[in-house]
């Protein structure tokens, strides 16, 4: 996967955004409860700098390295 961005999820690959693992956390208190959303992005795969070009090729990063 060194030549492709694993975070591409869009019709126009030049406008790809990061897609990571999302999970929810429910915090319960004696008086109230609320839901928080957290997102974990695989920075170890692309250093958080991965840009997708047309065809979903990786530009300006070390995806998968």
Curated annotation (Swiss-Prot):
Signal peptide: none annotated. GO terms for molecular function: copper ion binding; zinc ion binding. One of its GO terms (biological process) is intracellular copper ion homeostasis. It comes from the Eukaryota. InterPro entries: MT3. Keywords: Metal-binding, Metal-thiolate cluster. Expressed in leaves and rachis. Metallothioneins have a high content of cysteine residues that bind various heavy metals. Belongs to the metallothionein superfamily. Type 15 family. This is Metallothionein-like protein 3B. It comes from Oryza sativa subsp. japonica. The lineage of its organism: Eukaryota, Viridiplantae, Streptophyta, Embryophyta, Tracheophyta.
């Amino acid at each position: 996967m060194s030549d492709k961005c694993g975070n591409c999820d869009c019709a126009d690959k030049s406008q790809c955004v990061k897609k990571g693992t999302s999970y929810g956390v429910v915090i319960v208190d004696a008086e109230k409860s609320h839901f928080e959303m957290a997102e974990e992005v695989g920075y170890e795969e692309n250093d958080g700098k991965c840009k997708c070009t047309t065809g979903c090729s990786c530009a300006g990063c070390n995806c998968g390295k």
